[in-house]
């Protein structure tokens, strides 16, 4: 069974449990709407890739970890789109949750998905209680304060922004969660996988900045030009387009070098290369192809 199939099945099972009667029908519908259709499911795919590279001896726990992580990510998107933050009308090519269901239901949807993430892990804790506790700890750390995605959103309310801390929390946190949780689900030390997650997260932040500057709303499936609109710091402003692409490639080259020794090390390196290709804007792909460690 492929990663995508495993991820979708685990998320579907969790959402179905949240829709068991009696439950408020509109909120139940909004939960399903918020997680589907799934985007690239990049974070849970990275989690499963790391778990597989480490042996994946508890696949059901890996599935649960992947679904929990994606629930947190989807919750962050729902909250990020709210009028009090980005006030975005669209997400993944369709109306954002607050536009489709109302602002109060969007708040509740995001909150419910956060709770659901930890419910998923507790339901599967009997598979390996020690690993499950580790998964919950990492997910909590990378969601809340002081370094998780909540902190990342909080930085946008500060008069003076620590750019590195902002990017590390806003985007990087869930990538760190992905690599560490993948290792923990397979019985390995998650701390060794921190640098890989940090580097992938940093690269994705640069890629997001590039997309925001280069593509329109129809191409992105969400509002474009948000960094300029909200006065947010970004890599394009700092480095320019080509400089930002080179910076992203250097980050990902370091990511490959940071992969801990494991049975699937070579496969993981190929995955990072594939992500680099996907993240590079189409116009520049031929120029910046064939990434190698240290470039």
What are these regions (language model features)?
Residues 22-280:
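Mg2+-dependent prenyl diphosphate-binding active-site environment of isoprenoid biosynthetic enzymes
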Residues 1-19:
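N-terminal amphipathic/basic leader segments beginning at the initiator methionine
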Residues 276-295:
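Terminal targeting/low-complexity segments that flank the catalytic cores of oxidoreductases
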